A protein has these predicted regions:
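Mid/C-terminal beta-alpha module of Rossmann-like enzyme folds, strongest
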Residues: 6-8, 12, 187-250, 266-267, ...
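N-terminal Rossmann NAD(P)H-binding glycine-rich loop of SDR-like oxidoreductase domains
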Residues: 14-34
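SDR active-site strand-loop-helix element
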Residues: 17, 41, 79, 98-104, ...
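Conserved glycine-rich Rossmann-like NAD(P)H-binding loop of the short-chain dehydrogenase/reductase
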Residues: 36-43
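Conserved loop-to-helix N-cap of the C-terminal "lid" that shapes the substrate pocket in Rossmann-like
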Residues: 134, 143, 168, 173-181, ...
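A conserved pocket-lining segment of Rossmann-fold NAD(P)-dependent short-chain dehydrogenase/reductase
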Residues: 154-175, 183-187, 191-194, 199-201
Length: 290
């Protein structure tokens, strides 16, 4: 059963942790556009250009140093890495609603520090019993300065042919930054009790080969032929290409994860949050229109 869905008073401020990051900046702007007061919280004031009334706090610092920045918080968005959720729980007022960003990396077959940190943060939230939600996005694209499709487009400019592991048949379901922001704002507007975890993803899944072709089209690049190579060979090549000046780097771990299907059911995202994500082709068109 879905919880009741009622709006919070618009005048309640939202404390945004990680406000200087890509998702944090997008959330702050969207809140301001709706007339909702924002309390931006950053680790480094020098990175907070364009943000007003900032507070400086680092979730890796002792709890007593973080508490003052959150003392008056009733709604908190945390776009910092999910590994910081235990520290957030310790520092935030017990009554504050929490909306945190995780990652679908938690599902990888090859655990790493990033994915393990997401699992740690998710477990802390779910075990806390607090009114909070952790949203797990797939690959996020479309933010200013993002390092996913923009880096891929930059790499494609160097390649006469496109090598993909196993022919690029694994599925991906990237989510546009605007939809990530919409999900965060939708969660803020909901009322529920207890902790929740929810995957957010794009409207449609495509093969990685199709994804690359769509990035080519959207970025104005000519179509290049594909070749299928083993992941092991491509991972070995990645160690070599990392030394080439000016060539965008793709790490061996990233290549290995191209073998995983990353397609997800988004019915909870649509039903609970009420967000209908845009089509990948439309999102890429918006991204490269900048």
């Amino acid at each position: 059963m879905l919880p009741s869905q009622t709006s919070q008073p618009a005048a309640e401020p939202v404390h945004v942790i990680g406000a200087a990051g890509r998702s944090g900046q997008a959330v702050c702007q969207a809140l301001r556009d709706q007339g909702i007061p924002v309390v931006p919280i950053v680790r480094n004031a020098s990175r907070a250009a364009g943000l007003e009334n900032i507070r400086v706090a680092d979730l890796t610092a002792p709890t007593e140093l973080v508490k003052p920045a959150l003392a008056d918080a009733t709604r908190i968005v945390c776009t910092a890495h999910a590994r910081n959720i235990p520290a957030l729980l310790a520092a935030a007022p017990a009554s504050a609603k929490l909306v945190c960003l995780g990652s679908t990396r938690k599902f990888t077959r090859w655990p790493d520090a990033h994915g393990n940190g997401v699992l740690l943060g998710e477990k802390a939230l779910l075990d806390s019993g607090r009114d909070g939600i952790i949203l797990h996005p797939t690959m996020i694209y479309g933010a200013q300065g993002e390092n996913n499709v923009q880096r891929l487009a930059a790499l494609l400019r160097f390649l006469p042919v496109i090598p993909l592991p196993n022919g690029g048949t694994a599925l991906v379901q990237p989510i546009w930054q605007g939809d990530v922001t919409a999900c965060i704002l939708a969660a803020l507007a909901q009322t529920w009790h207890g902790p929740r975890s929810l995957v957010i993803a794009g409207k449609n899944a495509v093969t990685y080969k199709q994804f690359v072709s769509l990035v080519e089209q959207a970025s104005g690049l000519r179509s290049r032929p594909f070749i299928s190579l083993s992941a092991k060979l491509l991972m070995a090549c990645a160690h070599v290409t990392a030394r080439v000046p000016g060539l965008p780097e793709i790490g061996p771990d990233e290549i290995r994860r191209l073998l995983e299907n990353k397609n997800f059911d988004i019915s909870q995202m649509q039903d609970f949050l009420g967000v209908q994500p845009i089509d990948l082709q439309e999102g890429l068109a918006r991204t490269f229109k900048r």
